[in-house]
Amino acid sequence: MYEVKLDAFNGPLDLLLHLIQKFEIDIYDIPMQALTEQYMQYVHAMKQLEINIASEYLVLASELLMIKSKMLLPQSTSDMDVDDDPREDLVGRLIEYQNYKEYTAILNDMKEERDFYFTKRPTDLSHLETDESWDPNHTIDLTELIVAYQRVKNRVELNTPKSVEIRKETFTIQQATEQVTSRLKDKDHFNFFSLFTFSEPIEQVVTHFLAILEMSKAGIINIEQQRNFEDINIIRGVNYHFG
């Protein structure tokens, strides 16, 4: 009998990742029967306790059962020559979600480290003026976004007095999200670096990055860069809406 633990999870992929880590499962070679049983026991437990189950949990349950069924089907000789693993799409989504969690944890650590320090000094931003021509078909990955964050962080820290501690004013991810959404209200894209004055508190810079990660993950925005190390553009995603 498997143990069912009713923890709070951020969606069905979070639950699956928890089960994979708990039972030390190889994410690239998932035993679908065991994992599906664990997942279904969790869903059944929620039903028995009359917990409201989000539809996305039930959708993934159906997907797991379908993958499990495909894995149990006998393969013909011709099928053996085809590299078509029914788990491939699920594994890709789990790895992408795991990467988001790791990057979010890194940025949260950076935010906590510098929560109480900031400087406010005028900065010449004329060198950040960019050509408005850009290729909307070129996307960037999280690694390039982290590099961009480090560039902003380094510029802020150059003018940060290390020995001065002040009482911070909390700047939330919700506020940062609203700022980005508002910027896209009348224009379908804007330059990423224009979000920063390089004189704001470092915690505000980190909060903006966390908000951008979450908005990108949710499809509210897309993050585009024409070539490596050039300026980054934030554009409206398929799930963008204002108000």
UniProtKB/Swiss-Prot annotation:
GO BP: cell division; chromosome segregation; DNA replication
Location(s) in or outside the cell: Cytoplasm
An example Gene Ontology CC term for this record: cytoplasm
Classification via InterPro entries: ScpA (IPR003768), ScpA-like_C (IPR023093)
Similarity-based family: Belongs to the ScpA family.
Record note on quaternary structure: Component of a cohesin-like complex composed of ScpA, ScpB and the Smc homodimer, in which ScpA and ScpB bind to the head domain of Smc. The presence of the three proteins is required for the association of the complex with DNA.
Function comment: Participates in chromosomal partition during cell division. May act via the formation of a condensin-like complex containing Smc and ScpB that pull DNA away from mid-cell into both cell halves.
Protein name in UniProt: Segregation and condensation protein A
Gene that this sequence comes from: scpA
